[in-house]
Design a protein with these regions (language model features):
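Crotonase-fold acyl-CoA enzyme core
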Residues: 267-379
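A structural preference for short, pocket-lining loop segments at secondary-structure junctions
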Residues: 173-174, 191-260, 266-274, 279, ...
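A generic structural signal for short coil/turn motifs at secondary-structure boundaries
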Residues: 180-184, 396
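Short, aliphatic-rich beta-strand segments
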Residues: 169-177
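Hydrophobic alpha-helical segments that mediate membrane insertion or helix-helix packing
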Residues: 173, 192, 210, 293-294, ...
Length: 438
């Protein structure tokens, strides 16, 4: 495909986007449209999106090469989307469009992030661009690099929703969103990736530990909780983004937990990534995204009264890469029960042993954790975990999954049932906070 063909296709794409924008601009805001107006808007967007798909099916590699200067620049997801908005008008939403969307509740948005889903689905499935983007997302974040010298000096970092402490060769990451039971939003994803980067980049760290902190919620006051999953309140008010939460979470810190970090100054001919073993300790519960996390840890410990669940069918969204990994860990039957029917797995039941390595009473869990951390500091652990991961999950398989996930999750994010469920959750929380309607 020559430059003239790409230039012609670029002009056609921009023209189609303008036509779609003209139709939408003549209508009321999304929340105030009649059924007929919603149908008109949907038809205009569908026409433009079909052209975006065809454009990226043909030109994904050329587009990516232009945006990254022939793959000499390592752009992260948000940077790549921003560059695409400027270089290829109409391909993805502009910064102004996204800023306007962020001011609206989920039910009142136009759904421009679906166009980002189209873009990333095609980039990730491209044979050359996909692996390059995957590697770019394994590089340390600029925030982590800024904080690294101080962390190396003090062994401590308070990132807001995550606290990081280095003691005895262990990087201890504590999730401390006590206001929402460690439910994740864009902010926590950024904090988590920064913490994971710091732990991996510190040569004094030999193993990482992730655990939830003590809560202030009346029901769990003074007790540790691992994670309540996605923050549904943030979803309702439009605070969960496709790129900075749903895609960055999977391609960023979760993938780094599995494969390590690619540091530019890590000159090692036999291992370009800095990899370390990881332990997760589940107190209370690991719901949704919390349960997804466990699938990439080398050892999972849990309190005897803890439970795991992936209520994807109830929430209406796709549970990250759990559809990809859970079947490999627990088999197709249990995977379908957990994801499709919302089955809750108690740590004490036999099926939990497919997901949890060791169960302990709450008062014994600290001691069990320390023994596990000591075992994983053996010099041979890193090489053996690398070979196990190589056998269990190839980057090519993960890319294929994430390419499809990018689009399907974007569609789910703006589906009527997800918007309605998030709204009901928010209303329930508001009613509980103001029982007299005040």
């Amino acid at each position: 495909m020559d430059a003239e063909d790409l230039s012609s296709a670029r002009r056609a794409l921009a023209a189609a986007a303008r036509r779609s924008g003209d139709v939408l601009g003549a209508l009321p805001a999304p929340g105030g449209r009649s059924p007929e107006q919603r149908a008109t808007a949907a038809a205009a967007k569908d026409t433009a999106r079909a052209l975006r798909c065809r454009f990226m099916d043909v030109h994904a590699e050329a587009v990516y090469d232009e945006l990254t200067d022939g793959r000499t620049r390592h752009l992260r997801l948000a940077e790549l989307a921003e560059a695409a908005a400027g270089a290829f008008p109409g391909l993805v939403p502009t910064a102004d469009q996204l800023a306007a969307e962020r001011l609206r509740p989920q039910a009142g948005k136009e759904g421009h992030e679906i166009d980002q889903g189209i873009f990333f689905s095609r980039v990730l499935r491209a044979p050359v661009a996909g692996p390059h983007l995957l590697a770019s997302m394994l590089r340390p974040t600029p925030r982590a690099l800024r904080l690294l010298p101080e962390f190396l000096r003090t062994g401590s970092a308070d990132l807001g929703s995550v606290r990081l402490q280095r003691t005895g060769g262990v990087a201890r990451l504590t999730m401390c969103r006590d206001d929402c039971l460690n439910a994740e939003d864009d902010r926590q994803v950024d904090d988590m990736e920064t913490a994971v980067d710091l732990a991996l980049l510190d040569p004094a760290v030999r193993v990482g530990l992730l655990r939830g902190g003590e809560m202030t919620h009346p029901r769990y006051r003074g007790r540790r909780v691992f994670s309540a999953g996605i923050n549904l309140k943030a979803l309702h008010v439009g605070g969960i983004s496709l790129v900075d939460f749903l895609l960055r979470r999977e391609l960023g810190y979760i993938h780094k937990l599995l494969r390590g970090v690619l540091a530019a100054d890590h000159a090692c001919w036999h291992s370009p990534a800095i990899e370390k073993p990881w332990v997760a300790v589940v107190d209370g519960f690991a719901i949704g995204g919390g349960a997804q996390l466990l699938l990439v840890f080398d050892q999972v410990l849990a309190a005897a009264d803890a439970y795991l669940s992936l209520p994807a069918a109830d929430e209406g969204i796709i549970p990250g890469a759990a559809n990809f990994r859970l079947t490999r860990r627990a088999g197709p039957r249990l995977s379908r029960q957990v994801i499709l029917t919302g089955r809750r797995i108690q740590a004490s039941e036999p099926d939990a042993r497919l997901l949890v390595d060791q169960i302990a009473e709450s008062e014994e869990l600290d001691a069990v954790t320390e023994r596990c951390l000591a075992r994983l500091q053996s010099p041979a652990v890193v090489a053996n975990r690398r070979m196990q991961i190589f056998a269990e999950e190839t980057p090519e398989e993960f890319l294929r999954y994430m390419a499809e996930f990018s689009l399907q999750q974007a569609l789910r994010l703006y589906s009527d049932d997800v918007v309605a469920k998030a709204g009901r959750f928010h209303a329930k929380k508001q009613a509980a906070r103001n029982p007299d309607g005040g």
